[in-house]
């Protein structure tokens, strides 16, 4: 699982007072977002964190994905693409609601009769809550691109000799509306997921940490890599976050986008130990429980980092960056 958490969500117990640096960061985020709207790179929808993208914005993402392909293509990963929705039964089994209930998004639909429909329309006409009788469907919005992968691979039986390596990409949803253009509610995540022995997956993670730094260097972005934790919910979540950091299970590649003091996580490197192997029944060829790790690219965030550092006019980007992305 990859959960990007460069800018921690503000907990409900905070007071209304915020440090001056926070106010400055929020101003920078809003200013950058306004410029992106003015240039037409992002398209406002009236909902914070839900944006259309221009052809130019999409072209930058496509170019960076080709760089990902060139970097990892020789590894022989199996490419799988899932829709941005996951089987609700898989979602429930994943335990996501135990750790991140504040981020989840479920899909509800009208399932009533004609009289219920009349009541719904009346409620809409009167400005009432027409959603109260909507029922949950069997689909949940995908919270992380790799979530549908684990049950899918488990159904195949034991992993082949040498384990498994998978290339996945999906739109993901996180309910955290924000004026920060780098914290979107619907965004794309590209991942490589490794399943194998502990040494296999930790080596995989280190390889991609090294590759990530080189990739960002090639496109003119200054980065740092730091230990991190996922935004676990509640008081118990603080203990989980501390354990995650103490065991060095998560690292993030950070790039300043809207703030130099609070850089944005644009890549994430996660070691799950055998947690997903145990949960989903992922086994090695010899019957041992598989360990898993993943590397995630936040595609919109990387594109935003490029625009923030090199300018909103791609024609004026440094020649070396253009050559790296478009050849």
UniProtKB/Swiss-Prot annotation:
- Report which reactions are catalysed by this protein: an L-alpha-amino acid + holo-[ACP] + ATP = an L-alpha-aminoacyl-[ACP] + AMP + diphosphate
Report keywords, A-Z: ATP-binding, Ligase, Metal-binding, Nucleotide-binding, Zinc
Residues bound to ATP are 174, 176, 183-184, 250, 265-268, 301
Name what cofactor the protein needs. Answer: Zn(2+)
Question: In which residues is an L-alpha-amino acid bound?
Answer: 191
- Provide the function of this protein: Catalyzes the ATP-dependent activation of L-alanine, and to a lesser extent of L-glycine and L-serine, and their transfer to the phosphopantetheine prosthetic group covalently attached to the vicinal carrier protein Atu2571 of yet unknown function. May participate in nonribosomal peptide synthesis or related processes. L-proline and L-glutamate are very poor substrates whereas D-amino acids are not substrates for ATP-dependent activation. Does not display tRNA aminoacylation activity.
Q: What is this protein called?
A: Amino acid--[acyl-carrier-protein] ligase
């Amino acid at each position: 699982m990859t959960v990007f958490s460069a800018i921690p969500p503000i907990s409900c117990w905070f007071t209304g007072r915020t440090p001056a640096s926070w106010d400055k960061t929020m101003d920078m985020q809003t200013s950058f977002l306004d410029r992106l709207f003015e240039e037409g790179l992002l398209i406002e929808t009236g909902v914070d964190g839900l944006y259309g993208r221009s052809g130019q914005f999409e072209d930058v993402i496509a170019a960076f994905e080709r760089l990902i392909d060139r970097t990892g293509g020789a590894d022989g990963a199996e490419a799988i693409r899932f829709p941005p929705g996951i089987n609700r039964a898989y979602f429930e089994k994943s335990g996501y609601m135990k750790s991140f209930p504040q981020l989840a998004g479920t899909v509800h639909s009208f399932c009533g009769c004609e009289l219920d429909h009349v009541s719904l329309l009346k409620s809409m006409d009167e400005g009432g809550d027409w959603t109260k009788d909507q029922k949950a469907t069997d689909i949940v919005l995908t919270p992380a691109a790799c979530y549908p992968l684990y049950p899918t691979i488990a159904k195949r039986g034991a992993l082949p000799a040498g384990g498994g390596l998978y290339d996945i990409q999906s739109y993901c949803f996180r309910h955290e509306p924000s004026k920060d253009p780098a914290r979107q509610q619907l965004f794309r995540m590209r991942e490589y997921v490794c399943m194998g022995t502990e040494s296999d997956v930790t080596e995989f993670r280190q390889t991609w940490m090294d590759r990530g730094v080189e990739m960002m260097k090639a496109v003119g972005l200054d980065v740092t890599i730091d230990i991190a934790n996922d935004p676990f919910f509640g008081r118990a979540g603080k203990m989980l976050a501390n354990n995650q950091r103490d065991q060095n299970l998560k690292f993030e590649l950070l790039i300043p986008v809207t703030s130099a003091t609070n850089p944005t996580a644009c890549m994430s490197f996660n070691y799950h130990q055998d947690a997903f192997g145990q949960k989903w029944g992922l086994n090695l060829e010899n019957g041992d429980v598989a360990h898993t790790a993943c590397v995630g690219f936040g595609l919109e965030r990387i594109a935003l980092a490029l625009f923030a550092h090199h300018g909103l006019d791609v024609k004026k980007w440094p020649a070396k960056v253009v050559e790296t992305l478009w050849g």
